[in-house]
């Protein structure tokens, strides 16, 4: 199993879903974890749960649509812990919208959260990682970066941009031993996905119907993504940078039958 002992990690969007799964797993394998979410009480509650379980955890809150808040979140980690070793850019919005019908306001919000925030957080984290001799940045992307969906136009574009940024950053930061990798996530069962399905008018049967389309008999779980993130964050992947892991049950180019 990967070890993150003595590593300082920030996981954005870690008060629920995939982010919470990643942060919890990181804490369980030795990392000092900074929980982040838009609501301070939620972030503090998750951090308290981890501390009660014997782990090292702290919390910071903030709206990542604001560039100054992005900087503040990363700087808070550095100020409290003396540096940062691992950044997981997980926070994202999956609001629905087609390329034809989405408002400019929706487009701008999606790009701010899903693409600009990871960019700014990366910029700030690298300032600490370089003098520390390196670090690991893990971007949480989506299979939609490749194929898109008619009702996820802006979202898909933002995740495609994130993948391009991952590869560019990996090249630019290689000589500082800062590694940048990405996990493109497929259909995952989270509280947020449940909420979106209900907003789309689906009843409780949506999950049974969804599972029936999956060749391995279930949707992804946050724990699946957490294991992959721990690999990229740890020394198990010490010489891997610029890689994109597609965590999906359908290989690229294979259509569901």
List the model feature ranges, each with a label.
Residues 142:
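Residue(s) in the substrate-gating loop at a strand-loop-helix junction
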Residues 127, 171-172, 238:
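Alpha-helical segment proximal to the catalytic Tyr-Lys
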Residues 8, 15-16, 39:
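Conserved glycine-rich cofactor-binding loop
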Residues 88, 174, 179, 240-242:
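Short, small/polar-rich loop/turn modules that mediate ligand/substrate recognition or access, typified
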Residues 122, 158, 166:
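Active-site helix of classical SDR
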Residues 98-99, 106-108, 210:
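Substrate-binding pocket helix/loop in short-chain dehydrogenase/reductase
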Residues 147, 241-257:
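Short C-terminal tail/terminal secondary-structure segment
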């Amino acid at each position: 199993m990967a070890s993150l002992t003595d590593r300082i990690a920030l996981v954005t969007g870690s008060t629920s879903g995939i982010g919470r799964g990643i942060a919890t797993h990181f804490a369980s394998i030795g990392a000092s974890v900074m929980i982040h979410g838009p609501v301070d009480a939620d972030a503090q509650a998750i951090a308290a749960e981890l501390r009660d379980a014997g782990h090292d955890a702290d919390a910071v809150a903030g709206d990542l649509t604001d560039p100054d808040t992005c900087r503040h979140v990363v700087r808070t980690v550095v100020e409290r812990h003396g540096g940062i070793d691992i950044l997981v850019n997980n926070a994202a919005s999956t609001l629905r919208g087609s390329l034809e019908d989405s408002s400019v306001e929706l487009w701008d919000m999606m790009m701010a959260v899903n693409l600009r925030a990871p960019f700014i957080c990366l910029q700030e984290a690298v300032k600490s990682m370089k003098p520390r001799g390196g670090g690991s940045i893990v971007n949480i992307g989506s299979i939609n970066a490749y194929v898109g969906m008619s009702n996820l136009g802006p979202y898909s574009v933002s995740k495609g941009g994130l993948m391009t940024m991952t590869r560019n950053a990996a090249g630019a930061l290689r000589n500082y031993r800062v590694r940048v990798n990405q996990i493109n996530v497929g259909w995952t069962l989270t509280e947020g996905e449940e909420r979106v399905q209900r907003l789309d008018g689906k009843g409780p049967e949506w999950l049974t119907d969804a599972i029936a389309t999956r060749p391995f008999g279930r949707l992804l779980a946050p724990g699946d993504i957490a294991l992959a993130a721990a690999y990229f964050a740890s020394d198990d992947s010490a010489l891997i940078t610029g890689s994109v892991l597609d965590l999906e049950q359908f290989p690229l180019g294979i259509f569901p039958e």
